[in-house]
Amino acid sequence: DENPRETFGYALEELGKRQIAFFFTREHLDEGSISSYLKERSGSVPYIANMKLSREDAIDLLETGKAEAVSFGKNYISNPDLYERLVQNAPLNELIFDNMIGTDVAEGYIDYPTLIESVDAKQTVDTLN
């Protein structure tokens, strides 16, 4: 779209008149982002931010009122306990992209370790060494 601010701003205003429950964007938080503009145009419609958010990005968006909620996509695939990891500021598992699309391999979807499993495994290895 040549004029995303105007197009999506207008659409959001019209949707707001119809009392939608929320609006959700998948947009990078960079200089060209229109999320803040859309938030201003949304009136009282709650905004859910998403798109490669770090823990710090999410906290900033929520604490500054730039979003009412945040969501995570890919990080939930590789971190079944993402909420706990974010609360504890713990490291995240890296997503294995090679197994995501077009394979019959379950590996990389359901076998990522939780934080407790990762810590237990590390302690076991450290004990054996």
Residue ranges, per PLM feature:
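Flavin-dependent oxidoreductase catalytic cores
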Residues: 1-129
